[in-house]
Amino acid sequence: MRQRGFTLLEIMLVVLLAGVAATLVMMAIPAPKQQDSGWQIARFKAQLQYAVEDSQMNDHILGIYIQPHRWQYALLQRQVVENSPEEQQRLRYVWIPWQPYRMSVPSELPDSFHIELSTQVGAAGDGTGFSPGNGDPHVLILPGGEVTPFRLTLRNGNDSAWLQVDTNGQVHTSPEAEQKG
């Protein structure tokens, strides 16, 4: 009677060859880009450009909250205040997280990264009505295409990259980010 199937030795040989092939493929794949500050700045730039375009097309005000290891986009939305002391309805504006389907929000960075933000003094006007310390975002994106001038620097050990928006709304990046974008 003939035996059907494979012997244990044949099966083990196939598993060994598959493992070697998988190892060779993994060694050929480049290191993850998430650890590269230039790649992260290019990602932030793409998100910023999308937010500016969306703000212009949909006529709404957006903002960006910057924290040491993440950034979050927000939308300024009008709310009706119920039960106001007066008989008339009152309106107030609140910042809510903005999460378009095309953007991964919020943008978390690996723990080894650190974000530094500097804005121009007086960039937000005379200081009345806008204050990042009072819950307002650090960067404003207005429907006319205006963006609060700022400089964002990402550091990952000795690796760093920056993005700067000037008073004319032009976006400039470090050479590391331009190569990635």
UniProtKB/Swiss-Prot annotation:
Modified residues (N-methylphenylalanine): F6
An annotated GO cellular component: type II protein secretion system complex
Transmembrane feature ranges: 6-29
UniProt KW Membrane keyword: yes
Location of the protein in the cell: Cell inner membrane
Propeptide span(s): 1-5
Biological processes, Gene Ontology terms: protein secretion by the type II secretion system
The record's account of how the chain is modified after translation: Cleaved by prepilin peptidase.
Annotated keywords: Cell inner membrane, Cell membrane, Membrane, Methylation, Protein transport, Transmembrane, Transmembrane helix, Transport
Membrane topology: Single-pass membrane protein
Pfam hit, one: N_methyl
Stored InterPro entries: N_methyl_site, Pilin-like, T2SS_protein-GspH, TypeII_GspH
Complex and partners: Type II secretion is composed of four main components: the outer membrane complex, the inner membrane complex, the cytoplasmic secretion ATPase and the periplasm-spanning pseudopilus. Interacts with core component OutG.
Function description: Component of the type II secretion system required for the energy-dependent secretion of extracellular factors such as proteases and toxins from the periplasm. Part of the pseudopilus tip complex that is critical for the recognition and binding of secretion substrates.
Family: Belongs to the GSP H family.
Record protein name field: Type II secretion system protein H
Taxon lineage: Bacteria, Pseudomonadati, Pseudomonadota, Gammaproteobacteria, Enterobacterales
